[in-house]
Amino acid sequence: MAHTNDTIADMLTRIRNATMARHESVAVPATRMTRSIARVLHEEGFVSEWKEEGEGIQARVVLRLKYKGKGRNCRPIINGLKRVSRPGLRVYRNHKELPRVLGGIGIAIISTSNGIMTDREARKQGIGGEVLCLVY
């Protein structure tokens, strides 16, 4: 796996490419951040499961992608992934300014002082943070 400075953008691109190609699963390099994002995607029902394989530098997170419909009518559950905050331009929001994605259908993944969580959880806890990405 290639080395990248933005592991989140790399993860989102791999998921986007895998869903467009209708792959069953996708592997991304394992970091604390990719594990946390995988956990949130699973909790919110965007992926059916995630697991970690390998050890050390070879460790990777494998996400099992979800689709609705069968055959030619097969549509991915994840319609879009958008990186918001990036290494060159960080985006921070307080709990009142957190984005609502498609009126609550999608989620924003936020990095807070209490860990990685969805915009709904952060709003409920009354905390803001770095808006990592949008998933819908």
Swiss-Prot record:
It comes from the Bacteria. SUPFAM superfamilies: Ribosomal protein S8. Signal peptide: none annotated. Keywords: Ribonucleoprotein, Ribosomal protein, RNA-binding, rRNA-binding. Pfam families: Ribosomal_S8. InterPro entries: Ribosomal_uS8, Ribosomal_uS8_CS, Ribosomal_uS8_sf. PROSITE patterns: RIBOSOMAL_S8 (PS00053). One of its GO terms (cellular component) is ribonucleoprotein complex. GO terms for molecular function: rRNA binding; structural constituent of ribosome. GO terms for biological process: translation. Part of the 30S ribosomal subunit. Contacts proteins S5 and S12. Belongs to the universal ribosomal protein uS8 family. One of the primary rRNA binding proteins, it binds directly to 16S rRNA central domain where it helps coordinate assembly of the platform of the 30S subunit. This is Small ribosomal subunit protein uS8. It comes from Synechococcus sp. (strain JA-2-3B'a(2-13)) (Cyanobacteria bacterium Yellowstone B-Prime). The gene is rpsH.
